[in-house]
Every structure is written in structure tokens, then in C-alpha cells.
């Protein structure tokens, strides 16, 4: 019973880390979106903390896939006039958007992993 309680506590602490990771990504983007390189630098620091915590080659793949696919989707949407960004560097999107999409992908992947560990499946 004590083992289960300790494991449950660990999983909830992991979920808390994931939420802090996502909230920091959002707050840094809101605060520094006009200072593109500062935003990129701070978001990369958050990304590195996430990757160090999760330590998985799959997380790196998820980040790269999310960064590329998410940003590509935004470029297509901008190209068709769906929306625009207040600042843009390449193809209508700011450089920090790559990191934001990658962080979002890692966050959703890790939340799915934690929910699976807690028994929320099928």
C-alpha cells in the first residue's frame, strides 16, 4: 500500500512539472513575443529542462515532429489568410513558434504518459 501511495504521489508530481512546463512556455511567449531572440532563448531553456526531466529519445522526436508540423500548419493557415502573427520572421511566423509547438507536443505526449501510468486508459 505504501508503495502504491509513493508511486501515485510521484505521478502527480510529474503532472505538476508538466503543467509548470506548459504554463512557463505560455507566459514566456506572452511576455517576450516581440523580442524574438530573447523569447527563443528562454523557451529553449524551458525545452532543455523538459528534455532533461523526461530523458527519452522519443521525446526528442516528439519535439521535432511537433515543431515542424505545428509550424508548417501555421504557415499554411497564414498563407490562406486564416490569421496573422504580430511579429514574424520567416513565412509569416516568428522563430519562437517552432519552440512553442515543440514544447506543446512534448507536453501533450508527457501528459498522455502520466495519465496512462495513473491508469486512465481504455
Where are these regions (language model features)?
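Aromatic-rich, lipid-facing transmembrane alpha helices and their immediate juxtamembrane interface loops
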Residues: 2-122
Amino acid at each position: 500500500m505504501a508503495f502504491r501511495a509513493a508511486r501515485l504521489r510521484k505521478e502527480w508530481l510529474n503532472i505538476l512539472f508538466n503543467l509548470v512546463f506548459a504554463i512557463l512556455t505560455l507566459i514566456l511567449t506572452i511576455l517576450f513575443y516581440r523580442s524574438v531572440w530573447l523569447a527563443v532563448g528562454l523557451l529553449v531553456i524551458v525545452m532543455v529542462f523538459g528534455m532533461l526531466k523526461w530523458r527519452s529519445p522519443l521525446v526528442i522526436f516528439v519535439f521535432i515532429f511537433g515543431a515542424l508540423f505545428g509550424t508548417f500548419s501555421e504557415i499554411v493557415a497564414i498563407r490562406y489568410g486564416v490569421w496573422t502573427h504580430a511579429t514574424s520572421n520567416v513565412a509569416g511566423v516568428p522563430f519562437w513558434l517552432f519552440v512553442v509547438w515543440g514544447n506543446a507536443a512534448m507536453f501533450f505526449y508527457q501528459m498522455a504518459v502520466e495519465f496512462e501510468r495513473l491508469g486512465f486508459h481504455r
